[in-house]
Regions:
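Transmembrane helical segments that form the transport core of multi-pass membrane transport proteins
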Residues: 209-281
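Residue-level signature of catalytic and energy-coupling elements of molecular machines
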Residues: 64, 110, 184, 245, ...
Length: 365
């Protein structure tokens, strides 16, 4: 009888985790219908509500990797985590804040590669002393990022050493954007299908884990609900930021490179940290680096293409300092992850580089 009562309680009553989840979701929905006269309070309010939603997203995607593998789980985590960046980028373009949209996406890459990954490696290293990962995953992902970096450098050189008008630059950016999207799709085919065996650290991870299908559906449902809420909240957030920029004459680029990435990238960074603490270092790397790949090879090209239909011109031309900071982020990540092992000190190095970059950016803009 006691065992039956325990089973009954497990099945019919909501646990503490479900209560917290429902509370966060309900608060988020209520805030969508609240509008305060102060733009600063609105921005703070929507920024704060994005954090618990991002944590929920991170926990959900971490659970998914148990059922579909760390590579696919990391891919889903990165995809879901990049939805806010895409939405905030589109809304920024709609409000005419082109420089903030571009700086926000570049800042998201820097935040993922240095801060998010640094905290994940640091926390994972403190708990497990040493964590091993698949070098092929890291090398392939970083090679794709270097392709984007070379593309941006070539476009910058073209702008510096040739006479090209804005219309031609837009056309060039559109063509290159399509090429990057195609390469990204080919990379997914390579890593998930044709050579998926190369991206598995442990043979046991090839076998699917037994789990309740209802639990899996609940997790997917949670991810969908949280993603939708993040879409609407990001709209309100960008609208508030636009009002603050116009009222206080704050630099769009500074907000884009610092504030927007911290909020938009919170989901994948939280997921990366959770995975590292659970010793799923492959999923952690796939989330952080895979998110940067999606931003540079999918989100940015999509924004370039969409901007043409929105009446704005968004190209792939970045400033010299932006290119330097992005190169430093990729270079540091490459040197840290080339040996197939991570330690807490390497995470501390990545965090230190992020602090140096952000402090430098304060004086540049």
């Amino acid at each position: 009888v006691e065992e039956n009562m325990k089973d009954f309680k497990k099945k019919d009553f909501i646990g503490k985790e479900e209560v917290v989840t429902l509370t966060i979701v309900l608060i988020s929905i209520i805030l969508l219908f609240i509008n305060i006269d102060s733009n600063i309070i609105n921005v703070i309010m929507y920024s704060l509500v994005m954090i618990p939603l991002a944590i929920l997203l991170g926990r959900g995607t971490s659970k998914i990797s148990d059922y579909i593998g760390e590579k696919r789980g990391g891919l889903i985590s990165a995809t879901a985590g990049n939805v806010p960046e895409l939405m905030m980028g589109l809304w920024s373009i709609k409000y005419g804040m082109i420089s903030m949209a571009k700086a926000g996406l570049l800042g998201a890459v820097i935040t993922n590669m240095l801060l998010g990954l640094g905290i994940a490696v640091f926390c994972g290293g403190i708990k497990y002393r040493e964590q091993k990962f698949n070098k092929i995953i890291a090398r392939t992902n970083l090679n794709m990022l270097f392709l984007v970096m070379f593309t941006i450098i070539i476009i910058s050189a073209l702008n510096r050493y040739s006479i090209v008008d804005n219309g031609s630059f837009q056309k060039i950016s559109l063509i290159i954007g399509v090429v990057l999207i195609c390469v990204y799709i080919l990379g997914l085919i390579f890593s998930l299908y044709t050579h998926s065996n190369l991206f598995i650290l442990d043979e046991k991870k090839m076998l699917p884990k037994n789990g309740d299908k209802n639990d899996t559906r609940k997790v997917f449902g949670l991810i969908i609900i949280v993603t939708i809420l993040l879409y609407f909240i990001s709209e309100r957030l960008v609208g508030g930021v636009n009002a603050i920029v116009e009222e206080y004459k704050i630099s769009q680029e500074f907000l884009g490179i610092i504030l927007i990435p911290l909020l938009g990238s919170f989901g994948e960074n939280a997921s990366s940290i959770v995975c590292a603490l659970e010793n799923k270092i492959d999923a952690s790397l796939e989330t952080a680096i895979g998110s940067s790949i999606q931003i540079t090879m999918f989100v940015i090209p999509i924004l370039v293409i969409c901007s043409s239909f929105m009446g704005f011109q968004v190209n792939l031309l970045f400033s010299t300092f932006q290119i330097v900071t992005m190169s430093i982020a990729m270079g540091m990540s490459y040197f840290v992850f080339q040996d197939g092992k991570t330690y807490w000190f390497e995470g501390a190095l990545l965090i230190a580089v992020y602090l140096v970059v952000t402090l430098s950016y304060y004086y540049v803009v």
